Amino acid sequence: MIDQTAIIHDTAIVHESAVIGKGVEIGPFSVIGAEVEIGDNTWVGSHVVIKGPAKLGRGNKIFQHTSIGEDCQDKKYAGERTFLEIGDNNVFRENCTVHRGTIQDQSLTKVGSGNLFMVNVHVAHDCIIGDNCIFANNATLAGHVVIGDFVIFGGLSAIHQFGRVGSHAFIGGCAALNKDVPPYVMAAGNYAKPFGVNSEGLRRRGFSAEAISAVKRAYKEIFRSGKTVEEVLPVLTEMAATEPAVQLYVDFLKDNERGIIRA
């Protein structure tokens, strides 16, 4: 179903089962496949391919030569029915790729809202991405990666499959992540190491001086006390009782399986 207010270029191909919302624009030579739903006021540039099953929310902008919802690159994939969900107001610049999930996980790749994917960013199968993240040019996410909210990835950075990055973390350019990066942490290098708290990012997002100070104290417990994750969790849990910002650390470390980056 195509809403009557949608503007579709004569050279674009839209499958009869696709659902195209109000005010959507689809540019020249783009291909919208079966079981694709595109939310209101989304702009699709030229030479874009969107393959279903995939659901895109409102107000997204997808630039030329981007591929959304393609089959994954996992060699185990055998054509199973898997899915992609994308929220609202994301920007995908030129040549981005976002693949659907696999049955070995939850059969779903999921992207939140308000994210910016710069040129040549790759999001592999089964990734889960939160809201308001920035991925600079050529950032690469392997399969099954989980990214929190307000995370920034520098250009040419990459993360190993099943890796996690907590909310408000900052990943430097060309970083290679082979372990999890806890919330608030600045990480850089190959392999990446921690370089303190993303204080400037927290200030820009309205964190109080007291909250940032608590985050820094918790950071020192995690990375400078010599304690293991298991040993530091009770300390952080006690801190979180009076400092709510520390709870992000607690929740993240409770789910730690691959280990975290270390200096």
Curated annotation (Swiss-Prot):
It is found in: Cytoplasm. Its EC number is 2.3.1.129. Keywords: Acyltransferase, Cytoplasm, Lipid A biosynthesis, Lipid biosynthesis, Lipid metabolism, Repeat, Transferase. It catalyses: a (3R)-hydroxyacyl-[ACP] + UDP-N-acetyl-alpha-D-glucosamine = a UDP-3-O-[(3R)-3-hydroxyacyl]-N-acetyl-alpha-D-glucosamine + holo-[ACP]. The keyword Lipid metabolism applies. It is an enzyme of class 2 (transferase). Pathway: Glycolipid biosynthesis; lipid IV(A) biosynthesis; lipid IV(A) from (3R)-3-hydroxytetradecanoyl-[acyl-carrier-protein] and UDP-N-acetyl-alpha-D-glucosamine: step 1/6. Belongs to the transferase hexapeptide repeat family. LpxA subfamily. Homotrimer. HAMAP family: LpxA. This is Acyl-[acyl-carrier-protein]--UDP-N-acetylglucosamine O-acyltransferase. It comes from Aeromonas salmonicida (strain A449).
